[in-house]
Structure formats: structure tokens, C-alpha cells
Amino acid sequence: MRLLWKLVILLPLINSCAGESRFTRPIFIQEPQDVIFPLDLSRSEIILSCTASGYPSPHYRWKQNGTDIDFSMTYHYRLDGGSLAISSPRTDQDIGIYQCLATNPVGTILSRKAKLQFAYIEDFETKSRSTVSVREGQGVVLLCGPPPHFGELSYDWTFNDNPLYVQEDKRRFVSQNTGNLYIAKVEPSDVGNYTCFVTNKEAHRSVQGPPTPLVQRTDGVMGEYEPKIEVRFPETIQAAKDSSVKLECFALGNPVPDISWRRLDGSPMPGKVKYSNSQATLEIPKFQQEDEGFYECVAGNLRGRNLAKGQLIFYAPPEWEQKIQNTYLSIYDSLFWECKASGNPNPSYTWLKNGERLNTEERIQTENGTLIITMLNVSDSGIYQCAAENKYQTIYANAELRVLASAPDFSKNPIKKISVVQVGGDISIECKPNAFPKASISWKRGTENLKQSKRVFFLEDGSLKICNVTRSDAGSYTCVATNQFGNGKSSGSLIVKERTVITVPPSKMDVTVGESIVLPCQVSHDPTMEVLFVWYFNGDVIDLKKGVAHFERIGGESVGDLMIRNIQLGHSGKYLCTVQTTLERLSAVADIIVRGPPGPPEDVKVEHISSTTSQLSWRPGPDNNSPIQIFTIQTRTPFSVGWQAVATVPEILNGQTYNATVIGLSPWVEYEFRVVAGNNIGIGEPSKPSELLRTKASIPNVAPVNINGGGGSRSELVITWEPIPEELQNGEGFGYIIMFRPVGSTTWMKEKVALVESSKFIYRNESIMPLSPFEVKVGVYNNEGEGSLSTVSIVYSGEDEPRLAPRGTSVQSFSASDMEVSWNAIAWNRNTGRVLGYEVLYWTDNSKESMIGKIRVSGNVTTKNITGLRANTIYFASVRAYNTAGTGPSSPPVNVTTKKSPPSQPPANIAWKLSNSKLCLNWEHVKTMENESEVLGYKILYRQNRQSKTHVLETNNTSAELLVPFEEDYLIEIRTVSDGGDGSSSEEIRIPKMSSLSSVGVQILKPSTQFLTMVGFFYCFVIQPLSR
């Protein structure tokens, strides 16, 4: 009966909550702030801001000093939106603490406390101030005595009529706490009138006090005395977090005291500390916990020192560490909220509901920032505030508690309409209706109630779980939810699919670099389901869409084979084929081992090096899955072409050998070494080169070759040889040893040539007869000693130039462009000079200054044809003998005139006729110009079309017959013959083979005319000339 009454009471509330589910609580956008209002300001209104969001829009109330403001009773206060406007503010009525309250159907929130104060400063009294008399050297304090005020003040002093304020220094100080002016030691220049100026920043007003006269006494000068501290800071100062703290300390004394500061706990002053010019003010900006402690001011001079000290105590208003959050609970549930705030001193906590203090009772308990409400009912809904307060400030954390009571409802969270599972799989169908309190759940399959079994389970959250699903489990399932407020139900269908199976998985493979392989991945699956294949390599997805090099997916819908083309060492690893459907994810993995040539050996070092050997060590590189079988050592020098393999000890370096001796090196040569490894797959990349090292020096062991010489001047022996390459010089200080003696002599003469690049030595001696034979040997040496000598060669000494000129010189022109020069050979002997050949000189007038050229012939040749001459031109020629010493005297010059130029016009109007194997040709006689040679005859040049060999027929007539087998096309051209040479040729004529002609014809060619003519019984064909 009691439960029934509860339901009767709750039903209206439940209906109301259903309509309010879309309401949102008020949240402050803008809260009132502390205001110090200047009384003298002409503005006649104060605005305390307050704005809140929420749906529906909140309405506002205000409290002053804890009492609601009744806006209906006065026009002095009015609402401007949510803000409070105070017209014609008055100190006696309006000063105090204000709070804004924002309310909508969800609840009420209370704003922070805002303090309203009024800033002012009254005028100084107008009565005169007493004169202050001091001795020179004495300290003095001039009192300001500010008038009644409220708000922060600042102080300045002026001296006499000077508009500038008195500047502070070590001797003078204006306290911003008391406003007094302190002069540590009075000087004669200080005498005069002093005026105090006071400014109230909040009140926007400054006032000026009456002047204070300062006069100097005449009864002597003040002697020295120890400092007397007149400005002290309090013994205890409360300093807020992040505030700027200023401590003042100033002393009178003679001499003027020095001010210094320190911390009594011995810790250094914070780096952020600032000092005034006079050191009388210590400022600590952004005050923090670590800045609190005891501070001491020390004032000292020659007469002594004095101290002032005080304690800075850190305080901080509350700051939230943990706030409460909006909470939605079911009726009869329990609420637990906790809020935490930091602060110094530690804050205390108060709880409010809808702006009013929350009273504790049996269900509602509060303790140290926690709130517990048991057996919640709908009336507990509202806006709650946790207030954290210490003596410096109060802060609020706000949250909504919404207590829900409703019958089960599936409208927002129905059962999934279609659930799909595979045979043998497990399926969970969720049932999560909105129900307050929580509903009891039952299930139906079709129209029958479902019971739990070994495969069917009802989970705690109401879900239905079916294990090891069979095809018979398919069908419609309904979830029925019930609580004391009613019931609800929701249905869905279960569809059972066949399982997916990987029928051909990838398998382990062992492959060689450069091969192409296919990793299979084939499945059987339910035909109604799509299958997605994804391949992974060492855990990373292979993105085939981006066209990754080497990888390609091949196969059809049920085949996900992966082809790897030109496989590389980096492709060794694990390959995972995943098969995904909407219901499951299968995978199969295979290891691929890629074998390749070894990687480069590492850490190649030269342990020792001699003149011809080097000891090397190295570490093997990766074997790339195939054991290393052999190492090879290669060297490179500045003289070699690339890297060369070298001989080693041991001769064969197997895969377990990591050091060897290189032999056969050249002394005094810079070498680099590298090591190459090989295995069954091939030869790998070489190692990095070793450091560049030079073999030790040694005596040169290679003698020069091609020992030769001869020539030169009379009384000279010229010896030549092929220089020794730098890589065979074996050390520094390299040079050549020249040994020679006359044939028949037993004594060798010896000379040294120190130039490395030398390949020639000249020995001079007036006693040497021309063409005297010498035995010659050439050797080598360096700083290590003398090396090998070459074999003996015979070299002749220098000779004289020929002394005789050729006789019987003649010249004859054969054409327009060449001539032939003839002479008689010289019968020479040792006294007349050896003749190695002759030199022909030719020119165009009787002076050799117009020399055109010279041509040499060797041996006993006595004629020379000279070509490339100008036509119809007189040429002169002479001949002289030469040998290794030079040329002899020239023969007397002879001359000849070259022939005129050959005809420039080619034969024209060429006609031909062909009968059997006989070709008849006719053409017009060529007429020459005056400067051209007369036509002596004609040349017919003919060849088969596909052959390059040309046949020539000469005739003095303007016709010719050719007897040739015309089995193929012939190409024919005709040119003139004259004393000046052959003239211009006609255009090339193509004579077609017999089989291509229907009868016999005549071809007639003119530059611009083509015509057809009958000759006897033959046809005439006009054929275009071929392009040359």
C-alpha cells in the first residue's frame, strides 16, 4: 500500500521530468567583480555585471549583505538584463557585499561575492604648519599627515617653488606607507619650504598640503652618530599569492647610512627582487610560498649599524583542485560528490542547493567537502554549489543533479535490427533501455519465452549471449524490460552465415635475391559476404594502392595471393595475410628467407706495412642468409685504373679467414685496401676503403727501356729513354744514371740526371766525330741506392747538315691542279753529309717570300707530285737534302705553268637506246670558255644500281656503245676529258633493266623540257634525272 502511494505521488513528477529533459542549468558567463567607486565622479550610476546561459533563459535576483533586494520598492536599484544598476550611489546605503542569483526551471546558482566600496580623499586643513629647525648634519622627518580618505594613496613632495618633485637618493626618502619625507643628513641646500602632494588613484583626485618650512639652526653642526631607523616594516605582513610585496626601511645618520637587505634563514634573495634607487624599498613581485620568511634591513655607517626585521606570511585564496560535475541518477540511487580546493589557510566547505544553504538530515550528509544523499527522490533534483572559503575569498563550483524516474523506453536505444553471426561463433545482442530505476530484462525468441541453457546466457547488463551458434539459432529475438513504472520491448533479427576458412595459406619460403615469388592466400567463404585481403610485412601494412615497388596483389574474389617481384634482401621477414569480413578477421603467417651475396666486410684495418707487403684485418659483414665462402682483397693507388685484385698469403681466403698479408706491392706508393666477400649466391658489395697508407721506400728495380737517341748538333751525343712511371720509382730522390762509351773503348763515362721527368740526355764534346757509334746504358737510383741498368744500345753522335744540292731538277705540269718535280739523287759520303731524304719547296713567283709549301720525301725517292694547285699559274720549285742535323743547300729554282681549268659545262642532251644487251648513247659536244682547256675526249662512268664498283669507258667522239647484260638497272654519267683534267659530270641517268621495258626507247634530257619522239621502231622515254 505504501509503494502504491509513492507511485501515485511520483507519476506527475515523472511526466514533468520527461518534458524537462531538454532543459539546461544556468551557467555564469559573467559574474560581478569588486568595485571601488570614486565619490567625486560625475557618473551617476554603478553597474555590477551578471550574465548566465541556460534553457530556458534564467531570470535574476540580487542580494546585498545577504538580504534580497526588492526591486519593486525602489527605483534606486534596477535590473539591466541580469546586471544590477545602482542609480545615484550613496556610501551609507550602497556600500557592502553583493551576490547575483540566476534561476530557471532546472534550479538556481549563486555568484561570487562582489564588494562595493567608495574611494575619496578630503582636503588638507588650511592652517599653517610649524617651522622645523635642525642643525647641519642632523637627520629630520617632515610629516605629511594625509586627510581622511579611502583607497590607495601615493605621495610626492615639492621643494620651494620648484614644480618638480623631490628626487629620492641615499639621503632622501618618501615613504609610500606614511607619506613622510625623511632626510638622513641635512645640508645647507635643504633649507626651504616643503609641500606634500597626495593622490588617490581610485578617487581620481590629488590634494596639496600646507608648506612645512625647514630652517637651519645656528648653534653648530651636528657631529657624527650611528644610524637611527625611522622607517620600519611591520613585524608580520600577510602577503597574497602573486601579489607584489614592498618593504620600506630608511635610517637617519651621519654619515648617510647605507641600506642592505637579507633573509634571516640564510637563503639567497629571489632573483626577481627589485630595489629602489635609495635601496630603501625592497619589492618582491609575483609573491609565492617559497618567498615567505623573515627579512632583515641593515642600516650602517662608520659610527655603527642598526637593524629592522619582520616576517612575510604567505596566504592564498581558495583555488579549485577538484570540482563537482553534472550527475544524472535514478530514483532511489545514492549520490556521492566531493570537491577539493587549495588555499592558505585551508578553506572550509559549504553546500548550497538552488542558491540556499543545504540543511543536513538523515539522508543528506556533508563533511569536509563531500556530499552524500541516499535514497534519492525526484525532489532532490536541482543545482548544487560547493563553496570553498577562507578569510580571503569564497569560490563556488556548480553542478546539476537530475533524479530520473521513468518506465523502460527503447526509443533512443532500440535493439539492433539485424545481427549477423557465423556458424560456430558467439553473438551478444545488447538490451539497454532507458529505465529509472533499472528494469528487469527477459527475452523471447519468436513468441516463446527464451530460457538460459549451456549455449544461451542472460548477462548482467541485460544482453543476450549465444555461444557456438548454429543455423537453427536464426530468427527474431525480443527484449522485454519492466520496472514499477511500466514495461517496454524491442525486437531484432539474427542472421547466421557460413564461416570463412583460409584454404591455402602462405608457407615458409627460401629464395634468392632477384627472384619473383607468389605467396598464396586463398579462402572459402559465405557467398553473401565480401572478403577483404590485407597483407602485412613485419607488422606494417603493405599499401598496394600506392603502387609499392616489388609488391602486387594477384587473384580473384576469393584469392589474395601476393606477388613479390625482383625480391631483395630487405624483403626477408614475416608476411601476414589477413582476411576480413564484416564478422571476423582471420590471418596466416609465413616466414620468407631471402638469400643474397654477403654484405660489405667491416672495420678493414692495415696492421703493418712494408715496402712490398701489407698485413690486413677485417670483420665479416652480414652473410645475408648464405655462409661466406671466400674473401678477396683489392687495392687502389693513384696510378691504377679502379680497384685491382692482389695476391695474398694465404693464397685463398676462406670464409673463416679475417686477416691476410698482401704481397707484390710497389715500394713508396700510396695504397687503399678493401675486402670483398662471396658466397654461393654471388659476390657482395665491397667494404669501405681502408685509410690511405704509403709502402716503405726501396732501391728501384726497374730499368728504363727503349734506349735510343742520335741526332742533335755536331759534337753532341743525344741519348733518350722511356721515363720510369712514378709508381715504379720506389722512393724519394729518384733520378737516372747515364753510362756511355765509344764503340771499342773499355772505359765507361757516367752521368746522373736528377730530374724525375727527364727522358733525354745530351753529352757535348768537340772531339766527337759526326755519326760516331757509342755503347749506351741507362739506369735508375733513389735515396735508397742505385738500381738496375738497361741493356746496351748503340747510339750515334750528331752529324753535319748535307753539303751538296741536288742536280738535274725539273718540273712538269700534268693538269690544272698538279705538277711533278724531279731531281737526281745525291751520292753522299761521311764528308758531304748523310742524306736521309729530300725536301721540295714551291712558290708562285720568283721570290721565296711567297712560299706556298714544302713537302718531304724519305730515302732515295727522286720525284714528287704536288696537288691542289691553282690553274693556269706559274709555279717555282727547288729541292734540298735533309738529315737529323737539318737541311742542305737548295737546287736552282725551276718553273712551270699549270694547265687551264677543265671544262665547267657537263655534256648535255644525252639520248640513249637499248636493244638486247647493247646500249647506244649520244650527247652534244661541250664547248669550252677561253680560260678553260680544250675538250680532248669523254669518259662514260657506269655501274649497276646495287653495286659500288664503277667502270670507265673513254672516247674521243660524242657517242658510245656499251655491251653489258641489262639484268638490273644501270646508273650512267658522262664527263669531259682535257689537259686541265676531268670536267663536270652530267646528271646521273638510270637505265632500267630489260624486263621493265615494253620496248626500246630514247631518253632525252634538257634542263626544263620533257618530250617524246619516235626513232625508227623504238619508243622514246623521257626520264627525270636522279638526285645526286
UniProtKB/Swiss-Prot annotation:
The keyword Cell inner membrane does not apply. Specifically expressed in neuronal cells. In brain, it is expressed in spinal cord, cerebrum and cerebellum. At 17 dpc, it is expressed in hippocampus, cerebellum, and the brain stem. Strongly expressed after birth with a maximum level between P1 and P21, which corresponds to the time frame of oligodendrogliogenesis. This is Contactin-6. InterPro entries: FN3_dom (IPR003961), FN3_sf (IPR036116), Ig-like_dom (IPR007110), Ig-like_dom_sf (IPR036179), Ig-like_fold (IPR013783), Ig_I-set (IPR013098), Ig_sub (IPR003599), Ig_sub2 (IPR003598). The keyword Lipoprotein applies. Disulfide bonds join C50-C100, C144-C196, C249-C297, C339-C386, C431-C479, C521-C577. Glycans are attached at N65, N193, N368, N377, N468, N659, N765, N860, N865, N895, N931, N956, N957. One of its GO terms (cellular component) is plasma membrane. It comes from the Eukaryota.
